[in-house]
């Protein structure tokens, strides 16, 4: 069993509402700000105090949140993880000087790793939750995502395939501020262990997504994106 209490992440739901999920491996650093695209609804009276950026680690309402979880391992072949997260946010709280609301964000997360052999494994994870802001929960969304990854190692080579699905569902009645989005993607990766310290790799991904707020910014609702990246990694 694991658990903790925390503060300093009240605006986290902002990203899900106005950007949606994103497929990348970049971690936001402490005190970093993340700018939004020119969201049309930020020009309305209802959202006039919302900044065009989010500060994910800001404390707004002074409340403590918590998470609790359970880990279960079986015969060194199977690992199961379950977590429940609640930031205990007050959705009516607002810091006008920074333009950040406290979002009420809650979710459950389930993860499973299974080793078919010493060289082949499967990893799957699912997350489902809700997030809302405003005194009357003017922005009120639910979100869901899952991925499945299969990885196989052959001598110094490792090949992996991953499928992702994600969605944000808009439950509020603010027609001027659409938040719904959905997407799926597939990623293929090859890694080569050149030495104990050096690793080479290539990764290709394809993503198709749709977001209702894109049209207000004169962008197509549906987008398809592809990316190929090369990787050189040194560990010490």
Report residues per predicted region.
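Aromatic- and glycine-enriched pocket-lining scaffold segments that form the walls
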Residues: 1-77, 83
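Outer-membrane beta-barrel pore domains
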Residues: 77-236
């Amino acid at each position: 069993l694991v658990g903790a209490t925390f503060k300093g992440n009240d605006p986290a739901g902002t990203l899900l509402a106005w950007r949606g999920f994103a497929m990348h491996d970049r971690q936001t650093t402490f005190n970093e700000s993340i700018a939004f695209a020119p969201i049309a609804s930020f020009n309305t009276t209802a959202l006039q105090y919302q900044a065009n950026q989010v500060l994910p680690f800001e404390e707004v309402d002074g409340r403590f949140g918590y998470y609790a979880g359970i880990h279960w391992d079986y015969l060194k072949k199977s690992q199961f993880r379950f977590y429940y997260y609640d930031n205990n946010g007050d959705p009516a709280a607002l810091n006008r000087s920074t333009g950040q609301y406290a979002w009420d964000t809650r979710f459950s997360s389930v993860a499973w790793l299974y080793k078919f052999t010493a060289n082949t494994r499967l990893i799957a994870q699912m997350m489902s939750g809700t997030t809302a802001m405003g005194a009357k929960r003017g922005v009120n969304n639910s979100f869901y995502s899952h991925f499945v990854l299969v990885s196989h190692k052959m001598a110094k080579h490792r090949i992996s395939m991953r499928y992702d699905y994600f969605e944000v569902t808009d439950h509020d009645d603010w027609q001027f501020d659409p938040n719904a989005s959905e997407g799926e993607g597939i990623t293929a990766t090859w890694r080569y262990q050149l030495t104990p310290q050096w690793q080479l790799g290539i990764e290709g991904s394809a993503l198709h997504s749709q977001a209702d707020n894109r049209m207000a910014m004169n962008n197509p609702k549906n987008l398809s994106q592809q990316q190929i990246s090369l990787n050189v990694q040194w560990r010490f």
